[in-house]
């Protein structure tokens, strides 16, 4: 999703200062506890290992702070499959597109590789950020974050419901 500050302002009507305080309070609990309450999508870590073994270059581009992305990826078995873990940088005010660009920059993609790159995302912000970077985005509903029709309306190249469907789509 979008940066937390933006969400608190848009969804809760908070001022910039109020949103900053809400983020501080949120992270006060999330950083030591909530980060470990996530659940991975069934089968996704295994597919990531398989894709990596087959030569795919995998990266994470998240609006979460990068140090938290690293914790989550390590906890759920994704870190060894990812060549790059890119998250938001403190105080940088990064958009989703900024984080995607950061991941692609760190990967050092050639123009040919960029043409074969696809974003996989669970919210409209992922689809929109990918489009801003010139990438197609496959929407995934198996995380349960997107509302009904959200990914299609945002322009996802395809929408899948399971990790197996994602694998099947990527191989087609």
Predicted regions and their residues:
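A short, structured active-site edge motif that brings together acidic residues
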Residues: 79-94, 116
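Acidic, Mg2+-coordinating phosphoryl-transfer loop and its flanking beta/alpha structural elements
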Residues: 119-160
